[in-house]
UniProtKB/Swiss-Prot annotation:
<keyword id="KW-0456">Lyase</keyword>
<dbReference type="GO" id="GO:0009098">
    <property type="term" value="P:L-leucine biosynthetic process"/>
</dbReference>
<dbReference type="InterPro" id="IPR000573">
    <property type="entry name" value="AconitaseA/IPMdHydase_ssu_swvl"/>
</dbReference>
<keyword id="KW-0100">Branched-chain amino acid biosynthesis</keyword>
<dbReference type="GO" id="GO:0003861">
    <property type="term" value="F:3-isopropylmalate dehydratase activity"/>
</dbReference>
<comment type="pathway">
    <text>Amino-acid biosynthesis; L-leucine biosynthesis; L-leucine from 3-methyl-2-oxobutanoate: step 2/4.</text>
</comment>
<dbReference type="Pfam" id="PF00694">
    <property type="entry name" value="Aconitase_C"/>
</dbReference>
<dbReference type="GO" id="GO:0009316">
    <property type="term" value="C:3-isopropylmalate dehydratase complex"/>
</dbReference>
<dbReference type="InterPro" id="IPR004431">
    <property type="entry name" value="3-IsopropMal_deHydase_ssu"/>
</dbReference>
<comment type="function">
    <text>Catalyzes the isomerization between 2-isopropylmalate and 3-isopropylmalate, via the formation of 2-isopropylmaleate.</text>
</comment>
<protein>
    <recommendedName>
        <fullName>3-isopropylmalate dehydratase small subunit</fullName>
        <ecNumber>4.2.1.33</ecNumber>
    </recommendedName>
</protein>
<dbReference type="InterPro" id="IPR015928">
    <property type="entry name" value="Aconitase/3IPM_dehydase_swvl"/>
</dbReference>
<keyword id="KW-0432">Leucine biosynthesis</keyword>
<comment type="subunit">
    <text>Heterodimer of LeuC and LeuD.</text>
</comment>
<keyword id="KW-0028">Amino-acid biosynthesis</keyword>
<dbReference type="InterPro" id="IPR050075">
    <property type="entry name" value="LeuD"/>
</dbReference>
<comment type="similarity">
    <text>Belongs to the LeuD family. LeuD type 1 subfamily.</text>
</comment>
Length: 201
């Protein structure tokens, strides 16, 4: 079921890398599944693990640091989600527990896929993202609050405003995916179908 997104506060994990592509987010060998569940265990597989089986965590990768366990907000650098257009990338992030990604820029297809899957990608300036990186790196357990209704990010007694398409915002606030949007017009659809001549049914 789609999740309503109004306000979220969570631990932020700083992934200090630019041009993170979808193959790094979820490698191609894990794309056989046809449901959205179970991809989180393979998120950033090549970086998170030292072995192909995913049994030896890489202690030097930021998502494996004890201080960032349970993180639900991902900080990244520019052009996050570039590469192929696989929708499995936001599936993997969502299944891992990420609700928000904050970066200076995103690949267009990844940005749209994230919103379609009720995950919020937020664009802030390079300077604002750098401030958040410094805050999170310097403060263990640091949290960030995202308020979609006011379109603001709050951290370290500072507030950052972000833009989002009004229609996308409406869908997130109300937990609407494509099916949910269609069901909003269920009565009109039923009325239309009832007026279709019998020979066309």
């Amino acid at each position: 079921m789609p999740k309503e997104f109004k306000q979220h506060t969570g631990i932020a994990v700083p992934l200090d890398a630019s041009n993170v592509d979808t193959d790094a987010i979820i490698p191609k060998q894990f794309l056989q599944k046809v449901t959205r569940i179970g991809f989180g265990q393979h998120l950033f597989h090549e970086w998170r693990f030292l072995d192909d089986e995913g049994k030896q965590p890489n202690p030097d990768f930021v998502l494996n640091y004890p201080r960032y366990q349970g993180a639900s907000i991902l900080l990244a650098r520019e052009n996050f989600g570039c590469g192929s257009s696989r929708e499995h990338a936001p599936w993997a992030l969502d299944d891992y527990g990420i609700r928000v990604i904050i970066a200076p820029s995103f690949a267009d297809i990844f940005y749209g896929n994230s919103l379609n899957n009720q995950m919020l990608p937020i664009r802030l300036s390079d300077e604002e993202v750098e401030e958040l990186f410094q805050f999170v790196n310097a403060n263990e357990g640091a949290t960030i609050t995202v308020d979609l209704e006011t379109q603001r990010v709050s951290a370290n007694n500072k507030v950052y405003s972000f833009e989002i398409d009004p229609f996308r915002r409406h869908c997130l606030l109300n937990g609407l995916d494509n099916i949910g949007l269609t069901l909003q017009h269920e009565a009109k659809i039923a009325e239309y179908e009832s007026n279709i001549p019998a020979f066309l049914r």
